[in-house]
Regions:
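Boundary/linker segments flanking structured domains
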Residues: 1-92, 96-177
Length: 177
């Protein structure tokens, strides 16, 4: 359940830069904006074309592309916790990480060629593609973060409670201590 800001009465308070979900207060990280061409359209990348596919692997379900590139501020290096991606103020994805900067700068925001193929990180491809699609549809894409060591439990709880459209699993319940 998402609550209104008690101070300003907004669900996603632009004044507090906070988002309250259940009893957790997430801090605003950034607006996700892909790298752009001079005409304002997102640059498209096809990293799978750079992969030396010696084992003749097939592309994974989300590996075809195109993909985009984006990053977040380096100050989020080594920040452990739970993040949410909102598209036009709807929570579309909940995830956990042990380093938010790496998750977005080197995971979702910069697709490595190997991840496009079977056995690679297909989630990175899927989330990047979803972000690119949302951006091309002129939707607002925001990232919020909750710093916590209880990331597996909170991620699982929120995915179950929110039924987010981009999550394909319920997190990692086996890692909940």
């Amino acid at each position: 359940m998402v609550f209104l800001c008690k101070l300003h009465k907004y669900q996603f308070c632009i004044f507090c830069f906070r988002l309250k979900i259940n009893n957790y207060e997430f801090d605003f990280v950034c607006q996700i904006t892909p790298e752009l061409e001079t005409d304002g359209t997102p640059k498209k990348f096809f990293p799978q074309e750079r992969y030396d596919n010696k084992k003749n692997l097939n592309l994974n379900k989300y590996g075809k592309g195109p993909f985009c590139k984006f990053s977040i501020d380096r100050k989020y290096s080594l920040k452990t916790g739970v993040y949410v991606i909102l598209v036009d103020d709807l929570i579309e994805y909940v995830g956990e990480c042990d380093d938010l900067f790496k998750r977005f700068g080197m995971g979702y925001g910069n697709i490595s060629p190997r991840n496009c193929f079977e056995g690679g990180q297909s989630t990175n491809c899927r989330i990047n593609s979803n972000i690119l699609t949302a951006f091309k549809l002129k939707k607002s894409i925001q990232l919020y973060f909750l710093e916590t060591n209880d990331r597996f439990r909170i991620e699982h709880e929120l995915i179950i409670n929110l039924s987010t459209s981009w999550n394909k699993t319920s997190g990692k319940p086996s890692k909940i201590s």
